């Protein structure tokens, strides 16, 4: 048994987690890829030509638009992924990949983007997104997923966190320590431009990203806002905010680069585990208005590369958006973003993987029933920068 395999939850689109995984595959270019689902078109051909093994769910013709319907099947499918006889497995997980069954004697290192948010720290959000009759079934499903996570956490040899808030959640929910390796940003592809007067929102249009908060704050500040992204909230947002926002949908990389470079600022209204878009905007020399918690508080220097405001405060967000952003130095901002470059990520990731001991895992502390109860896991904890 020899060699190394790379595992990711599912490769259906090319967002932050998938771009991070793409950078991981460059560190080990000959390693096979194992994933629950794969869409070459949706991932813009980024993984074309690689040896990719998928789960049996691939036969169902699942896409980004309907894959959530298979949520109850993903844990079992993850456990049954055909890994092969490799002595090292590196998974990239936001929910399922860390639960794979590794070959006997293999070492499993998991790069964790976040514990599955709807099973842990955002249960209330998940319940609000389904009708009342379905909520008991969803509660049961999430309880089963927490049990799945706890079993997985006993088998993973080493977790790596993408930021302080993820590290805290890994320790609180699963009783594991995790070094931090910040996700990569392809900073070289961005350039500064002549800023316009609009602010920009970039992200999946789902409730936990709070696009409505960004639009309302921009309207209160008298700012134009352009919204990049698609998702289940798109129709609702268009109906509610007609004339208050310009919805651009999904855009290609070149268009996104231009939008970043010409924006007055990027607005990030929610708490992110890392917040890739915040670093991308800074790489383009644009300041970021975000929440003083989570990943954005780790990547944005208040007053120098952006402005940080309290969580959930629309008025504070609007007040920040009234700022004259031309006072920020685009050169200093883009230089700051280079500390999150792809090269820095890849070097650090390789160092951590190579340093992992093959000694049996020992829990850092016991996980009590109270810590895994719905009341406990629904509570949010600020990051310790």
Spans of model-derived segments:
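Active-site donor-binding segments of glycosyltransferases and PAPS-dependent sulfotransferases
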Residues: 30-98
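Membrane-proximal helix-turn-helix segments that form the acceptor-binding/catalytic region
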Residues: 127-159, 167
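Conserved donor-binding/catalytic core segment of Leloir-type glycosyltransferases
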Residues: 187, 191-228
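Nucleotide-activated donor-binding/catalytic signature segment of Leloir-type glycosyltransferases, i.e.
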Residues: 235-255
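Acidic donor-binding loop of glycosyltransferase active sites
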Residues: 261-273, 286
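Short hydrophobic beta-strand element within catalytic cores of glycosyltransferases
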Residues: 287-292, 300
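A charged, aromatic-enriched C-terminal amphipathic alpha-helix characteristic of glycosyltransferases
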Residues: 325-367, 371
């Amino acid at each position: 048994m020899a060699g190394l395999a790379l595992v990711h939850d599912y490769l259906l689109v090319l967002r932050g987690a998938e771009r991070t995984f793409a950078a991981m595959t460059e560190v080990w270019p000959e390693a096979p890829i194992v994933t629950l689902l794969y869409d070459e078109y949706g991932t813009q051909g980024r993984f074309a030509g690689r040896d990719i093994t998928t789960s049996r769910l691939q036969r169902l013709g699942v896409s980004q638009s309907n894959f959530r319907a298979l949520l109850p099947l993903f844990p079992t499918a993850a456990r049954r992924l055909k890994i092969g006889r490799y002595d090292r497995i590196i998974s990239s997980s936001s929910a399922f990949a860390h639960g794979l069954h590794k070959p006997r004697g293999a070492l499993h290192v998991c790069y964790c983007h976040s514990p599955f948010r709807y099973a842990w720290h955002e249960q209330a959000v998940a319940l609000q997104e389904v009708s009342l009759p379905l909520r008991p079934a969803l509660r049961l499903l999430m309880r089963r997923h927490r049990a799945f996570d706890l079993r997985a956490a006993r088998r993973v040899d080493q977790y790596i966190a993408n930021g302080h808030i993820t590290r805290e959640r890994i320790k609180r929910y699963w009783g594991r320590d995790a070094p931090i390796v910040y996700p990569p940003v392809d900073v070289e592809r961005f350039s500064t431009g002549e800023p316009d007067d609009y602010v920009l929102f970039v992200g999946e249009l789902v409730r936990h990203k709070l696009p409505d908060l960004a639009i309302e704050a921009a309207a209160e500040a008298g700012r134009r806002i352009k919204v990049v992204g698609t998702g289940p909230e798109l129709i609702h947002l268009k109906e509610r905010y007609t004339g208050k926002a310009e919805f651009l949908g999904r855009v290609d990389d070149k268009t996104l680069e231009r939008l970043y470079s010409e924006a007055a600022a990027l607005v990030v209204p929610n708490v992110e585990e890392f917040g890739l878009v915040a670093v991308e905007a800074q790489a383009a020399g644009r300041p970021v208005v975000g929440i003083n918690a989570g990943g954005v508080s780790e990547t944005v220097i208040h007053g120098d590369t952006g402005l940080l405001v309290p969580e959930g405060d629309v008025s504070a967000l609007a007040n920040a958006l009234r700022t004259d952003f031309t006072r920020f130095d685009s050169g200093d901002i883009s230089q700051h973003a280079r500390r999150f470059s792809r090269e820095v990520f890849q070097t650090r990731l390789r160092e951590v993987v190579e340093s992992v001991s093959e000694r049996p895992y020992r829990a850092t502390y016991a996980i009590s029933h109270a810590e895994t109860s719905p009341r406990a896991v629904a509570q949010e904890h600020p990051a310790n920068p």
